[in-house]
A protein has these predicted regions:
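Positively charged n-region of N-terminal signal peptides that target proteins for export
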Residues: 1-6
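Bacterial N-terminal signal peptides
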Residues: 7-17
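Sec/Tat signal peptide C-region and signal peptidase I cleavage site
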Residues: 18-22
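Short, solvent-exposed loop/hinge segments that bridge or flank secondary-structure elements
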Residues: 27-66
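Edge beta-strand at a domain terminus
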Residues: 51, 118-132
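Hydrophobic/aromatic beta-strand elements that line small-molecule binding cavities or substrate pockets
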Residues: 59-61, 99-106, 126-130
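Contiguous, well-ordered beta-strand patches that form the walls/edges
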Residues: 65-100
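Short, exposed beta-strand-loop hairpins at the edges of beta-sheets
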Residues: 103, 111-123
Length: 132
């Protein structure tokens, strides 16, 4: 009986946290993402794979889905299109001759993004956490 009570108590304490975790990346709160791996691509050559910082990309980006902003290295770009689709936040924008498209998993916080410009493209993979 004591073992059952301990399991029940553990479940009762953890269940609210699990419910909150599932709603973490629903777009209601800003979050910060670490860009981990990136691929730098150009026509006619193989893509270069490396850490985002090695490819001179920002290490961190701040995303405010409600405020429709995407910020890195002191620069802020407007999010022109934002949607929640099948458990993912999806948003796009453009600035300085480049377009970006980013997807963040609502439950995982995993980020996949692409930036495209004239004869160049970057694909990035990262992980996000909520802003305290």
């Amino acid at each position: 009986m004591t073992r059952f009570r301990l399991w029940f108590l553990a479940f009762a304490l953890c269940a609210p946290a699990l419910a909150l975790r599932a709603a973490d990346f629903d777009g209601s709160r800003p979050f910060v993402c670490a860009l981990i791996e990136a691929h730098d691509c150009a026509p006619g050559v193989a893509c270069t794979k490396g850490l985002a910082e090695d490819l001179k990309l920002p290490t961190f980006v701040r995303i405010d889905f409600q405020g429709r902003t995407f910020a890195a290295r002191g620069r802020t770009s407007p999010i022109r299109n934002a949607q929640r689709v099948d458990g993912q936040l999806i948003f796009q924008g453009s600035e300085n001759g480049r377009s970006f498209s980013v997807t963040v998993g609502e439950t995982s916080g995993k980020l996949v993004g692409a930036v495209a410009g004239d004869g160049e493209a970057f694909v990035v993979f990262g992980a996000c956490t909520l802003v305290p």
